[in-house]
Design a protein with these regions (language model features):
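Sec/Tat signal peptide C-region and signal peptidase I cleavage site
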Residues: 18-22
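Mature extracytoplasmic or organellar-lumen-exposed domains after removal of signal/transit peptides
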Residues: 24-369
C-alpha cells in the first residue's frame, strides 16, 4: 500500500466519527479546479513540506548543541538555554508534524521524534529506568538509536530536562542524565536530516508528489495527490482535537487529566497546539489550497480562514500550566472553545472543502474510489 493510502485509510476512520452534513451537497458546484492542481502540488512540496523539515532539522541541531554545552559547562543559564532550544524544536516539529505521510512514516521515524500518547505510562517508566541504570552506552547517538522509540523521542528529552531529578543538569558536569539527553537530541537531529534529505532529492519523493504519473510510487494522477493533501488537512485537524485537547480534557473538569497533555512538564502544550495549527494554516495558504475550489464555493475558504485564525490566536492566551488552566473558569472556557472550533475545522475540511472539490467525508480514502 502506498504511504498516502495508509494515511487515507486512517483518515476514513477518523472522519467517520464526525457528523456528516455536507455529503448530499458533494455534487454541487463545478468540483475540483484541475488547472490549479499542478501549482498547488509544487507549492505544497517546495514552499511548505521541504522548508518545514529543513527548519525542524535546524532546530534539532541547535538543540543538540545546547544540550552538549549544558553537559560541558552546567549552569542555571545553560539549562534555561537548553529548555528554550527544546521549546523551539517543539514549535518547529509541531508545524511539520501534520504531514504524517511520506518518508516520516517509514522506519518508525515519526515515533522516533515524538512518542505520544503514552496512555499507560510505559514510555515514562522506560526513561526513568534507563536514567536510574546509567549505562554508558546510552550516552551515544548510536546507543540511543538502538533503543525503543519511547527512549529516543521528544517526550524522553522533555523528561530529562523537566522531570524528577532534572536539577542535577545545572550543577553536575558531564552527568549521565545530561549526556543521555544530548544523545536523544542528536538522534532526533539525525532522523530529521534523513527526512529532509529524502524530500530534497530531486529524483525522489518530491518528484513523485509534484508530478503524479502511473510510474510514480506515490500518486498515479492529480486526484490521488489532492486526496493526500486533503487527508493531511482533515487528519491533522482531527488529530489536533483528539490528541492535543481530548487527551486530557473533554469538557468536564472533574474528569480532566492534565498530566496526559503533550509536553505538560515543559509548559509546551499550547506551543505544540499552536504549531500544529500554524502547520495547517501554512499548507492551506502557501499551497493555495483554496484555488482548487470552484468559483461558487469560495465562501468555504473564508470560513476555514476564520476557524484557523481563531484557533491560532486563542491557544497562546491560555495558561501553559495545564492543571491550573483546567481549574480556572476563564482558561477552561477558552479550551472549550478550542474543542468546538477544532471540530468545526475538521468538518470544514472534510465535508465542506472536500465536498466542494468532489471529495467528501463519505469518499473512500482507503481505495481511491
Amino acid at each position: 500500500m502506498r504511504p498516502w493510502k495508509r494515511l487515507a485509510a486512517s483518515l476514513l476512520l477518523t472522519v467517520a466519527a464526525l457528523p456528516v452534513h455536507a455529503e448530499d451537497k458533494t455534487a454541487t458546484g463545478a468540483g475540483l479546479n484541475e488547472a490549479a492542481v499542478p501549482a498547488t502540488l509544487q507549492k505544497a512540496v517546495d514552499d511548505v513540506i521541504r522548508p518545514g523539515y529543513r527548519a525542524m532539522h535546524d532546530s534539532a541541531s541547535k538543540l543538540t548543541a545546547a544540550m552538549k554545552a549544558l553537559c560541558a559547562d552546567p549552569s542555571t543559564a545553560r539549562l534555561a538555554s537548553a529548555k528554550s532550544a527544546f521549546g523551539d524544536t517543539v514549535k518547529s516539529w509541531s508545524r511539520i508534524e501534520i504531514v504524517d505521510t511520506g518518508p516520516i512514516i517509514e522506519k518508525n521515524r515519526f515515533e522516533h521524534i515524538l512518542f505520544y500518547p503514552d496512555r499507560k505510562g510505559v514510555g515514562l517508566k522506560q526513561v526513568q529506568a534507563l536514567i536510574a541504570k546509567a549505562d554508558e552506552q546510552d550516552t551515544t547517538v548510536e546507543g540511543v538509536a538502538g533503543k525503543s522509540v519511547a527512549l529516543m523521542s521528544m517526550t524522553a528529552l522533555e523528561y530529562v530536562l523537566d522531570g524528577n531529578g532534572s536539577e542535577v543538569l545545572a550543577t553536575e558536569k558531564q552527568n549521565f542524565r545530561c549526556r543521555y539527553g544530548a544523545a536523544v537530541a542528536g538522534n532526533i537531529e539525525s532522523t530529521t536530516k534523513e527526512i529532509a534529505d529524502e524530500w530534497d532529492a530531486p529524483e525522489g519523493v518530491q518528484k513523485s508528489w509534484k508530478f503524479p504519473s502511473k510510474d510514480s510510487s506515490d500518486f498515479t494522477d492529480n486526484k490521488e495527490a489532492v486526496t493526500a493533501l486533503l487527508g493531511v488537512l482533515v487528519h491533522g485537524a482531527v488529530k489536533i482535537r483528539d490528541q492535543r485537547l481530548e487527551s486530557f480534557y473533554k469538557g468536564d473538569p472533574a474528569s480532566a487529566r492534565p498530566k496526559m497533555a503533550v509536553y505538560w512538564r515543559s509548559g509546551n502544550t499550547w506551543t505544540s497546539f499552536t504549531g500544529n495549527i500554524e502547520g495547517l494554516k501554512t499548507l492551506w495558504e502557501k499551497a493555495d489550497m483554496a484555488s482548487l475550489l470552484p468559483s461558487d464555493k469560495r465562501d468555504v475558504a473564508a470560513k476555514i480562514d476564520r476557524l484557523l485564525n481563531e484557533l491560532a490566536t486563542t491557544a497562546p492566551t491560555i495558561n501553559p500550566d495545564i492543571e491550573a488552566a483546567v481549574g480556572k473558569d476563564t482558561d477552561r472556557a477558552k479550551i472549550d472553545r478550542l474543542l468546538s472550533v477544532s471540530r468545526d475545522l475538521a468538518k470544514g475540511f472534510s465535508d465542506e472543502y472536500g465536498g466542494a472539490i468532489g471529495l467528501s467525508a463519505g469518499f473512500s480514502f482507503a481505495d481511491g474510489d
